[in-house]
Swiss-Prot record:
Transmembrane segments: 23-43, 56-76, 79-99, 108-128, 142-164, 182-202, 230-250, 255-275, 298-318, 329-349, 368-388, 401-421
Protein name: Probable nitrate/nitrite antiporter NarK1
Annotated gene: narK1
Organism from which the protein derives: Thermus thermophilus
Phenotype seen when the gene is deleted: Mutation has minor effects on the ability to grow anaerobically. In contrast, narK1/narK2 double mutant is unable to grow anaerobically.
Family per similarity comment: Belongs to the major facilitator superfamily. Nitrate/nitrite porter (TC 2.A.1.8) family.
Main function: Probable nitrate/nitrite antiporter that may be involved in nitrate import and nitrite export during anaerobic growth.
Length: 443
């Protein structure tokens, strides 16, 4: 990594081009990755699918968007993010187009799985931007790039209008498909165009921190426990984000009886802070330190989910005089939305804080470490919805969705805090067994 101020200033325009174009590309990839959440309704109607069959389409896309993040990050470090990201854009365009031509449920499953490859672009962008930005700017840069998560809402906003406006027969004699099939076709075209823009719009001389290093050598950092601890943090702030983005519309409909379009809009009040506040989290991590921001993150999530997991009923209070007071507890949609918004705020700043740790501890291995952390975090988005469903089925309480989140956040917080205490003891050995105040020193 370059530390010469003159060289850093000279490369500033190149850094910014990498940042903004990679962010735009990632937003598009994220939109294509999660497009089946909105397309599910017309797909189910056309193919006569059950809820379980439909759920597998999105699940396979999410799964494949997780599996290759480690490898993608390593390849970006070794061959440069410009090449790897461009190839991923072109590759993802192929199954996106094939989705628009799918004629059976089995074909949809296969093509959705392949489209899911788009989710792995996150690791490429993280490694790429880390290679270009100096340490004191990495938190903000990675936060800006990660804000491409807002692509999760793109199809929610443009999808229904486009599906309704494009004729079912399409255009040019069906060459451009109509109805729901127009959306994956449009994404396929945009992905190809974005591939050319990224290739010709970013510096030809790329940064390759892993060039020439043996592949196994790039995997060595994965033996450190802190890598797996960071992964658990990311399950909380990203895996749960992906899971709740898919789960909340159903929750609003089932628990509060809202129509689907209102449920989708209220879900966006969770998605936007969880995505767009990522640059803020990066800036705060640069200024105050990533660990302190993680304390804030877990505090917000624990507080909000702790209230949300409370079932409706009565709270019984006893005074000192023995009097009994009974208070009815109900969760209105306004309070629920506010608390979910707060969880989104915590996740938004927390995602950037997790990734701020990585170039600090592993400056030469951001691709491998960031890839593993991203992979396990995204796998959380695959496994958490079934956990939500089982918790609700076992208890009969929809609020148990947030008990799962509370438990996961509590475990992560406890692990982090015990690690911090251990670090403090190592830095101040003399206080380990002698921590009482001496004389008149103030506390």
């Amino acid at each position: 990594m370059i530390h010469d101020p003159a060289q850093l200033e000279k490369e500033r325009p190149d850094r910014l081009r990498v940042l903004w174009l990679s962010t735009l590309a990632f937003t598009l990839m994220f939109a294509a990755w999660l497009m089946f959440g909105v397309l599910g309704v017309p797909i189910r109607k056309e193919f006569g699918l059950s809820d379980v069959q439909l759920s597998w389409i999105s699940a396979l896309a999410i799964l494949n968007g997780s599996l290759w993040r480690l490898l993608a990050g390593i390849l970006a470090d070794r061959y440069g993010g410009r090449l790897v990201f461009t190839l991923m854009l072109f590759f993802t365009a192929i199954p996106a187009y094939l989705v628009s031509r799918a004629g059976s449920y089995e074909e949809l499953l296969l093509y959705a799985f392949l489209v899911g490859f788009a989710g792995n672009s996150f690791s490429v962008g993280i490694a790429w931007n880390s290679a270009w930005f100096p340490k004191d700017q990495q938190g903000f840069a990675l936060g800006v790039f990660g804000a491409g998560n807002v692509g999760a809402s793109v199809t929610k906003f443009i999808g229904p209008a486009l599906i309704a406006s494009v004729p079912a027969s399409g255009y040019l004699g069906g060459l451009i498909p109509g109805g729901w099939r127009f959306i994956p076709f449009l994404y396929a075209v945009l992905l190809v165009l974005m591939g050319f823009v990224l290739w010709f719009g970013t510096p030809r001389k790329d940064k390759r921190p892993g060039q020439g290093r043996p592949f196994l050598d790039m995997l060595k950092p994965l033996r450190y426990v802190r890598v797996w601890r960071f992964s658990l943090y990311y399950v909380v702030v990203f895996g749960a984000y992906v899971a709740l983005s898919a789960w909340l519309p159903k929750y609003y409909v089932d628990v509060f009886g809202l129509p689907l379009h209102e449920a989708a809009l209220l879900t966006a009040l969770f998605i936007f802070p969880a995505s767009l506040l990522r640059p803020v989290g990066g800036y705060l991590s640069d200024r105050f330190g990533a660990r302190r921001i993680m304390y804030w993150t877990f505090g917000i999530i624990l507080l909000a989910s702790g209230v949300l997991m409370m079932p409706e009923g009565h709270i019984v209070l006893y005074t000192k005089q023995g009097a009994k007071e009974v208070m009815q507890f109900t969760m209105g949609v306004e309070l629920f939305t506010l608390l979910v918004f707060l969880i989104g705020v915590g996740m938004g700043i927390g995602k950037a804080a997790v990734y701020k740790h990585i170039p600090t501890y592993f400056p030469q291995d951001v691709g491998a470490v960031g890839g593993l952390v991203g992979m396990l975090g995204a796998l959380g988005g695959f496994f958490l919805p079934p956990l939500f469903a089982y918790a609700q089925a076992w208890t009969g309480l929809p609020q148990m969705t947030f008990f799962v989140l509370f438990l996961l956040a509590a475990i992560s917080f406890l692990w982090m805090h015990l690690t911090v205490l251990k670090l403090l003891q190592q830095e101040a050995q003399h206080l380990k067994n002698d921590f009482e105040l001496k004389g008149d020193r103030p506390c």
